[in-house]
């Protein structure tokens, strides 16, 4: 009878957004326990070997990590299967590169290059605000952080801006109608838009109606929405496409236009 955690993960059972080859082997890296869920993270080995192409093999990845070249959220990480997740900042000082893990409009993780100034902070969604022993207030974030004595105005589902050097809250964004959000779950993962309406349903999920910059409207659950800026200005730079999901016909037209431009050139 099985006891404890499984230490292996079959490749066919790995999340689709890891984009692993079916025929590349029987197994996939099993994410370690950490700040993100195993189905909502990207292990460091896949970032270094499969995405950044700094290593060809498992052993080369271990060699790079053991030389303490890779930082996640400003801390050196040597665990090859450390689970990096949404909004995490991956830094490689040796090459002066910084990346932020974001979603593209197809729900896949995208390593988005950022400047050194942007790598000094991170946005975190507040899961809950509670009171501990002796009435000390504290909040929990989506990535497992616990921060004591937060601003009394910060509530659940708001977003806080954290300085990664001091781990202090620098600023916060209220979860309000009119603010820009990114969807982090469901069929609309990776889409960016402004909150237009909140529908409260007793005993069920709250529904959030979002409109992107092209005027397309869609709805999703409250738990799938992550506020990334005040008004329509995001506090983090966004990947190519700015979180706008095109229809199949619009994508085809865009490809045809690019092919025509290349032919004329």
UniProtKB/Swiss-Prot annotation:
Secretion signal: which residues?
none
* MF-aspect GO terms: RNA binding; rRNA binding; structural constituent of ribosome
Q: Cross-referenced PROSITE patterns, in alphabetical order?
A: RIBOSOMAL_S4E, S4
Q: Which domain of life is it from?
A: Eukaryota
- Location (main, coarse): cytoplasm
Q: What is an example of a Pfam family matching this protein?
A: 40S_S4_C
InterPro entries documented for this protein: KOW, Rib_uL2_dom2, Ribosomal_eS4, Ribosomal_eS4_C, Ribosomal_eS4_central_region, Ribosomal_eS4_central_sf, Ribosomal_eS4_KOW, Ribosomal_eS4_N
Q: What is this protein called?
A: Small ribosomal subunit protein eS4
Name the encoding gene, please.
Answer: RPS4
